[in-house]
Amino acid sequence: MYKADSKIAEEFIDHQEILDTLEYAHNNKSNRALIEQLIDKAAQFKGLSHREAALLLECDQPDLTERIFRLAQEIKHKFYGNRIVMFAPLYLSNYCVNGCVYCPYHLKNKTIARKKLTQEEIRKEVIALQDMGHKRLALEAGEDPLRNPIEYILESIQTIYSIKHKNGAIPRVNVNIAATTVENYRKLKDAGIGTYILFQETYHKENYESLHPTGPKSKYAYHTEAMDRAMEAGIDDVGLGVLFGLNTYRYDFTGLLMHAEHLEATFGVGPHTISVPRICPADDISTQDFPDAISDDIFCKIVAVIRIAVPYTGMIISTRESAATRRKVLNLGISQISGGSRTSVGGYAIPETPEENSAQFDISDTRTLDEVVNWLLDLGHIPSFCTACYRAGRTGDRFMSLVKSGQIANCCAPNALMTLKEYLEDYAAPDTRAKGIQLIKKELEHIPNPKIKEIAIRNLKEIEEGKRDFRF
């Protein structure tokens, strides 16, 4: 039986509730009056239930679909403006004991090059990332209790935070590692992580078990209940996601929103972020083996409806997607993107040769960070390297209350401009710098609070003179 605030995976992700939701959406996909009513409700910026959102996703009326896209753009702008937070993944190790059939890290893969970074290698990778201009990392590692124990992850986090190269620093380390215990989540909390990220992959229990036949990850309930353990351990910010294409997208879309509702019902705060990766080619993995892979049009609609249903959450897209696809979804809901990414173990300090391939998946957007920043500036977005909320304790329910009230813009807008200015001064190519300076000048005029605007202008001037690390 469906129960949003249950601690049991099969109750807060209830299979029958998802089937009933999909039937409801299918039966009403041409019900203009009902769909218009839901669009009007969503325009109040309070979100939608999983059942209501499933109907918008299923809507087959072209003019109403266009209204859905316009509303998603409006909601994105209201809560996140034209700011796009930049980050990069750092893969520590691809040793893994699981048997996930869609991931080249799986235990039986004998063709992939296995690697694990030493602390000295991590130091070199972080310096390379800092020299690119990155301030925020997403730490990744395969699940291997012997080679990648929690102690290795904790030591790696400490190493990353300790490195200050030239004007560089990594003030926020988000962590994407396998489901673990409350005790280990407390250790991650004490290590000062930002967001704990864990993709569900698919919410369909039977399909999940067939995709994860062996290893610790094969335990559906333990994996699905991981965010509860993380939040019980005191981690304020958690990030959800599914790998679209492993199962029917309608099912996983609904399960994803039910998971968000569960966190809100149980802990009073929903997911800090939602990621929307799609299955893509990798070493010994072909997308042809996954018949549920989705088209660009469906992908864009998924992004738009998630933004409408969960207006407060950050939305992440990686370099799995091409530049063209990333451009489409920026206005529809995405608020964080990676740039200059490597999905190999390391690879920033010294790029891998083809023979050394250790990557988890193939990258579609191969541009450098500066090329991505330049592109965002051309599109009128503000590339943001801000980590202020985490450092000021604006996490969990405190962050969400600011987002839901719209007050977060008083912090985020000037912080984005100041961190962009730092990037322009320290790392940008001349053309990128010129474009960025013009955008900052334009965006300063949109800061409504005169006092904040005055302080921002003063700080920007001091950044030009060599000072760093200003924040509201």
Segments the model singles out, each with a brief description of its role:
Residues 141, 195, 200, 221-285, ...:
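Conserved C-terminal portion of the radical SAM core fold
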Residues 211-217, 288-292, 358:
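Short glycine-enriched, charge-decorated loop/helix-capping segments at active-site entrances
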